[in-house]
Swiss-Prot record:
NCBIfam families: FtsH_fam. It comes from Rickettsia felis (strain ATCC VR-1525 / URRWXCal2). The gene is ftsH. Binds 1 zinc ion per subunit. GO terms for biological process: protein catabolic process; proteolysis. Zn(2+) binds at residues 417, 421, 495. Its EC number is 3.4.24.-. Acts as a processive, ATP-dependent zinc metallopeptidase for both cytoplasmic and membrane proteins. Plays a role in the quality control of integral membrane proteins. This is ATP-dependent zinc metalloprotease FtsH. HAMAP family: FtsH. It is an enzyme of class 3 (hydrolase). Residues 28-103 are periplasmic. It is a multi-pass membrane protein. One of its GO terms (molecular function) is ATP hydrolysis activity.
């Protein structure tokens, strides 16, 4: 229990004790003893002349019998009581109520209101001076990081080497400022970490705290603003006063966009409290008073909404981008998290990194944890590559729906659909290496073919885009070849959407259409409120764009059809294997098409290593294929 809880409990116990004490004395004063009789018995004794004397105090009557015994009774409103007593020769003594009251009780009653007010005043004064902070709204909520517990250092941070290098310089400055001051350098006043969620901004701040060996205060941007006017500005002042008293030190503000948004844009219902808080922060960071030795590090994933005055040099001298890691960064991050679990030699961080493009550090940590949970649920002693693959598919596509009731007809159709994707991907030029194919339903998909690029692709050429379109259309083509045009299903809707997006990007953004040319078509400005941008393309040009998109998709469709028609036997073999095994790795598919057995010992041990064993001759691109077909027709 904290100090505030103990203080409230003490005051409550004292109040209850006083009330009980008051009741005890009041009861004792009213009854005066335990020999009580009813008023009817008292009147009977008076009429029988057995009562010698009575002492009346208010409505309480204390009587003495002729034999010397005493008794007590309580009298109602009885006007003839005195006449009845005198007529029966009873001696009467009337005592005022005040003379019988206990001295301590009288003192307590007279002084209790004053004592209560004094006690309440003392209680709140103690709280305002830091006892429980009942009224300390203006106190900063910045928490000083404790030295107890395991420290996080830069060794625990991987995949963001550039950001680590920038922040290491700040840590070195705090440790030995003379090294930089000899050359006239000044300590940076602020550093802003910018990046999407989960990339490690807060982890970097914790690593700085573990490396710097200086006081480290942490606070959230939402901790400044409350319902009371002026509280936010007061907390900012108190936070910087704490920093000055502990300089050199670091103050970390997480999610600074909660308090640092643009001023005067009319958002937030016209609340000026947040703007007052921001103004005070601007003054404290770079005003008339210097804050030597106090370094502000802030983190946000919304730099576009921050006020410009907050971003200028002198306040945040450095803006460090913490982006999602590339393939090498993902591999390093996976190795850091794999150290925390038990795994065997089949787990290859590089393969996992290739299959998780765009993953943040937090998502990779979650993937490793999911793999450990899956292995534990299956009763394994170590995590293997199968568990990592299952965890990756679960994160990307959802939980496997093995309980779904698929008919043999649907299962066969799905096998040919996914087999078409896989086969065209093997023969298509510039297509990424095939990783695996499965017909196990996950999420909204009945199956999946996964291709993993060797490295992260930041741009694509025409050949790569055309290959991707052909692979997208291959599932629909396989359904049409095997089951006929009238039996084609809606399962290829997402494939058609993906192919259309690539084709439209080729025409309107990449300038890869000879008819349209290298001209950008689309909105040249982004709307911060999420509204649909206006169309800047004429109707005539839009018709040409649609025609070009259709032409590119048709070429990819025909190219995929040529491959599947030419290798129809391999399509049947692959589809039958998928029906039997449900999931095949890229290596297993290559072994199958080359006539090798699927259940070799090496393949079962390392099913997802992607080691090439056979060479697949790539077909010509759609443009070259169309040209060759035209020449053969002319001949």
């Amino acid at each position: 229990m904290n100090n505030q809880g103990r203080s409230i409990l003490t005051w409550a116990a004292l109040f209850v004790f006083v009330i009980l004490l008051f009741n005890v004395f009041q009861s004792d004063g009213l009854l005066g003893g335990r020999n009580n009789i009813t008023f009817s018995d008292f009147l009977t004794r008076v009429d029988e002349k057995t009562v010698n004397s009575v002492k009346i105090q208010g409505r309480v009557i204390e009587g003495t019998s002729n034999d010397g015994s005493t008794f007590n009774t309580y009298a109602p409103d009885y006007p003839d009581l005195v006449n009845r007593l005198t007529s029966n020769d009873v001696n009467i003594e009337v005592v005022p109520l005040e003379t019988r009251m206990n001295t301590f009780l009288g003192f307590l009653i007279s002084w209790f209101p004053m004592l209560l007010l004094i006690g309440v005043w003392v209680f709140f004064m103690r709280q305002m001076h830091g006892g429980g902070k009942a009224m300390g709204f203006g106190k900063s909520k910045a928490r000083l990081l404790s030295d107890k517990g395991p420290k996080i250092t830069f060794k625990d941070v991987a995949g963001i080497d550039e950001a680590k290098e920038e922040l290491t310089e700040i840590v070195d400055f705090l440790r030995d400022p003379s090294k930089f001051q000899k050359l006239g350098g000044k300590i940076p006043k602020g550093c802003l970490l910018i990046g999407p969620p989960g990339t490690g901004k807060t982890l970097l701040a914790k690593a700085i705290a573990g490396e710097a060996n200086v006081p480290f205060f942490s606070i959230s941007g939402s901790d400044f603003v409350e319902m009371f006017v002026g509280v936010g500005a007061s907390r900012v002042r108190d936070m910087f006063e704490q920093g000055k008293r502990n300089a050199p030190c670091i103050i970390f503000i997480d999610e600074i966009d909660a308090v640092g948004r643009h001023r005067g844009i009319g958002m937030g219902g016209g609340n000026d409290e947040r703007e007052q808080t921001l103004n005070q922060m601007l003054v404290e960071m770079d005003g008339f008073e210097a804050n030597e030795g106090v370094v502000i590090i802030a983190a946000t994933n919304r730099p576009d909404v921050l006020d410009r005055a907050l971003l200028r040099p002198g306040r945040f001298d450095r803006q460090i981008a913490v982006a999602n890691p590339d393939i090498n960064g993902r591999e390093q991050i996976l190795k850091v998290h794999l150290k925390k679990i038990k795994y065997n030699s089949t787990v290859l961080a590089r393969i996992i990194a290739r299959g998780t493009p765009g993953f943040s550090g937090a998502e990779l940590a979650n993937l490793v944890n999911e793999a450990a949970l899956i292995a534990a649920r299956l009763g394994k002693k170590e995590v293997d590559m199968h568990d990592m693959e299952e965890a990756k598919d679960k994160v990307l596509m959802g939980v496997a729906r093995r309980s779904i009731a698929m008919s043999e007809k649907e299962k066969r159709l799905t096998a040919y659909h996914e087999g078409g994707h896989a086969l065209v991907g093997l023969y298509c030029p510039a297509a990424s290496p095939l990783h695996k194919a499965t017909i196990i339903p996950r999420g909204n998909a009945l199956g999946m073919v996964q291709r993993l690029p060797e490295t992260d692709e930041y741009s694509q050429n025409r050949e790569q885009m055309e290959s991707s379109i052909a692979v997208y259309m291959a599932g629909r083509v396989a359904e049409e070849i095997i089951f006929g045009r009238n039996k084609v299903t809606s399962g290829a809707s997402s494939d058609i959407k993906g192919a259309t997006n690539i084709a439209r990007a080729m025409v309107t953004k990449a300038g890869l259409s000879d008819l349209i040319g290298p001209i950008f078509h689309g909105s040249s400005s982004d709307d911060m409120y999420g509204r649909q941008p206006s169309n800047e393309t004429s109707e005539a040009t839009a018709e040409l764009i649609d025609a070009e998109v259709k032409k590119i998709i048709t070429q990819g469709y025909e190219f995929a059809k040529d491959i599947l028609t030419k290798h129809i036997d391999q399509l049947h073999t692959l589809a039958n294997a998928l029906i039997e095994y449900e999931t095949l790795s890229g290596q297993q598919i290559k072994n199958l098409l080359s006539g090798r057995a699927l259940d070799s010992e090496e393949e079962n041990k390392f099913p997802f290593n992607d080691s090439p064993t056979i060479k697949i001759d790539k077909e010509k691109s759609p443009e070259k294929a169309k040209k060759a077909k035209k020449e053969s027709t002319n001949i």
